[in-house]
């Protein structure tokens, strides 16, 4: 019965995670916090606090989870974690027909503690790297830039096929309108880093071919952190004298947490899934409250600890040395309200929550690659040729779980300078063809218009006299929203482009949620 309840809980929390993910769209109602799962990650909370050198109040749910882990053990991994649920489902498909003849090897178990120490050490030196391994961040990221756009593309193709068939057109249109309200994106969006993000996620699932929950057992640093706190639990597995030593519980344990002495459970590995009690024929296993000393040991020797520390320091040095291209840095435009670059990278966990919600408005945010150096990989940047920063939108700051993007009032945001637009006169139609083009000025959202015209009479190469409106940018008014670059009719590279010149970034910010 308990095992069935756990499975229902897993399904519920996965659906809740997906529902909150879909809720992150314009118009966004923050009464349903779409970032609550991200703010529940103790790994993201700890590494971000260490890297930013400040407590981030919005991550308080992560502290609550750690406090619950002390008496209850790693219940989050077995009952709540949405990535764990996805891995369980994937393992059922990948390992169909496979069974374990005995306890599997534990030689890789120390890797997750190695990764955890390396991440914490790097965070102490102000390098935020937990985003690559955090399961909640990983699932949010792959949904945003890979799975959700692919689902939307396939669904739209299905509707086009249905409409082309000529049958039940009215019903197709009704269904499509409903799905576009709740499920489908407002507009089709593609992301530059969708393939690498998808490959990482696929690799995590493919590890199930090696063993059940290989990622959770051996690589997940969040599981390692929860495992450290769960060693003091007062609720857990208990085996009575009815045990016949049949080893079925050990063979069915998805976390390899049951020792060769079947009465001993590694408290740092057990995820309270209750599967061992379900398969125990003499019903010798139960889960109950009661003080119990820590069983099992953290398999991380002094040598491995030193190696993990060195790995974190070397990783920090490698990313800091790998500077970005100077030209690309000049086009590395951050979202409005972003902290100063160093503080921004310290806090940003690369969850792509801002990218997700931006795709329902101006759709300018994309995950970066190395435009700002290796330290900035997968951090959000504005690519104005694919989108623009909506003048009446502040959603990226509202949904950021760590405060890397500050919350701005609309009036403040509309004056916040992301950068400055410049004309490439060798491509601009009025400048090189001597023909009027008003597109950029017409789309400029500022009431006073940051793009103006210098109207002059000129002679064409054919000797004809004509009056041409030559556009120019009022740099003191331009906020760098990028809609001019996005709407520029010139094929290929736009004739007007936004750079970081004059950008306004917050030098210091109060802790997120304060």
Listing of model-derived features with the role each one plays in the protein:
Residues 1-263, 267-269, 274-514:
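Non-ligating segments of multi-cofactor redox enzymes
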